[in-house]
């Protein structure tokens, strides 16, 4: 990844990925991925095999986390959508920030309502108190 630069861009129309090889005279732009859905946060996760993540907020279908394992050539939705546990009685409004967690597969999310939480991207083993399932 050191021989090129990758830039992720979250917009109201989805996520775009721009990349360039050295000496960065021009960038190739791909996207939008998750078209028509606002993306408020993106993350380039360099732990192990590099991955790109984007949070998408669809007013009808809710929150999704998009993942790219090929450095932005394509994106897929993670197996589970982020959500509060049912017993908390809260709905997730938006993911404002994504951050790599302490474990190899942990992804932390900063969400509206002033909560942060995280867990394994596949949807198991939550790594926060009782706040947010990813």
Give the predicted meaning of each segment.
Residues 1-134:
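Extracellular glycan-interacting surfaces
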């Amino acid at each position: 990844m050191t021989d090129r630069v990758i830039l992720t861009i979250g917009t109201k129309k989805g996520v775009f990925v721009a990349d360039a090889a050295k000496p960065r005279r021009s960038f190739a732009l791909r996207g939008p991925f998750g078209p028509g859905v606002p993306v408020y946060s993106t993350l380039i996760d360099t732990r192990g095999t590099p991955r790109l993540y984007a949070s998408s907020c669809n007013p009808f279908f809710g929150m999704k986390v998009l993942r790219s394992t090929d450095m932005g050539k394509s994106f897929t939705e993670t197996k589970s959508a982020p959500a509060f546990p049912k017993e908390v009685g809260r709905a997730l409004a938006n993911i404002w920030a994504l951050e790599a967690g302490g474990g190899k597969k942990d992804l932390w999310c900063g969400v509206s309502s002033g909560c942060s939480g995280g867990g394994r991207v596949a949807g198991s083993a939550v790594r926060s108190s009782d706040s947010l399932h990813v």
